Amino acid sequence: MIGTPYTEGARRAMLLGCGELGKEVAIELQRLGVEVIGVDRYANAPAMQVAHRSHVINMLDANALRAVIELEKPHLVIPEIEAIATQTLVDMEAEGVNIIPTARATKLTMDREGIRRLAAETLGLPTSPYFFCDTETEFNQAISEIGVPCVVKPVMSSSGKGQSVIRDIALSHKAWQYAQEGGRAGGGRVIVEGFIPFDYEITLLTISAVNGIHFCAPIGHRQEDGDYRESWQPQAMSDEVLAKSQAIASKVVEALGGYGLFGVELFVKGHEVYFSEVSPRPHDTGLVTLISQDLSEFALHVRAIQGLPIPNIHQHGPSASAVILAEGTSSNIRYQGIAAALEAVNTQLRLFAKPDIDGRRRLGVALARDIDIDSAVSKALDSASKVKVIF
């Protein structure tokens, strides 16, 4: 049963993290009559602008996190970012609070070590070779064993922060320092991974719902500086590779438990598929589903977490997204060229309405459909290029 917002019978959902992905989740929740409470570390975050009300707290402060959950008494607590006091969520789940998809899934996936050990050591899934390192001495030893090229990432980071590829061992110290600066909790543990010369990488959006496991068509994407720049759907792949990808994703999602949409990242090399990472929530590369599917990844997530069925997922055809990226410093961001960006048929824009910028920041995304993937990507890039960010 779903009541009406602001009434005694309302179903309340709390978003922990109010960025652009959380904003779309908030909109989908409201479409089903759910009262939405946004929580983040800064005011006027995108999802806060569409939530019924919001709170600003330090998300890593266990006491502050507990206090806001106890104050609002939400029926659903939906983590939308990794930088949260996850042990508090584990404790509160044991007290009866409904954490989406589960507190264990949130805690395991908040750092790369938990999910990599689950995938490789518990589930026996194929991954790149890896070492976890606490000191630069361990780091150098790991590089010597894995060899170059290799990939270095903080165990806790997002959007490519602190991530680099070492192609020359002489640059290892620089990579160590960069990883220490890029972690969400400051300096600390890193993962060194063998570099897989993959043919392509995909995100397989996998939904655990009341009526079973469902998959969206695979999403291909291009990364730059550890962050996505374009994504497209469907990614062309053989039936054999798709079946292997779905089998890996199913194992990971079932091991994590709970209902919801999971973004499973995979590398494909020839006929082999390697597990990379997973997010127990909508994925940034999945923004393409806002134009490519009848039910976006956000709509699917909101259905699943409320125990609602997913009878089918319709994919409209070759589609793409291209990021609108800006760099600068401002608290008065404006946009020009919107009309030009929307001139072509089957194009859409999402401007995230982020309140400020200090450095490089993703401020929106252009979406497009066309007769084939190359045309869709080209159209999305052209649309994105016409949006001018004014400071």
UniProtKB/Swiss-Prot annotation:
Its EC number is 6.3.1.21. Keywords: ATP-binding, Ligase, Magnesium, Metal-binding, Nucleotide-binding, Purine biosynthesis. GO terms for biological process: 'de novo' IMP biosynthetic process. N(1)-(5-phospho-beta-D-ribosyl)glycinamide binds at E20, L21, E80, D284, K354, R361, R362. Mg(2+) binds at E265, E277. SUPFAM superfamilies: Glutathione synthetase ATP-binding domain-like, PreATP-grasp domain, Rudiment single hybrid motif. The keyword RNA-binding does not apply. Residues 117-306 form the ATP-grasp domain. Transmembrane segments: none annotated. The keyword Flavoprotein does not apply. GO terms for molecular function: ATP binding; magnesium ion binding; phosphoribosylglycinamide formyltransferase 2 activity; phosphoribosylglycinamide formyltransferase activity. It is an enzyme of class 6 (ligase). Belongs to the PurK/PurT family. Involved in the de novo purine biosynthesis. Catalyzes the transfer of formate to 5-phospho-ribosyl-glycinamide (GAR), producing 5-phospho-ribosyl-N-formylglycinamide (FGAR). Formate is provided by PurU via hydrolysis of 10-formyl-tetrahydrofolate. This is Formate-dependent phosphoribosylglycinamide formyltransferase.
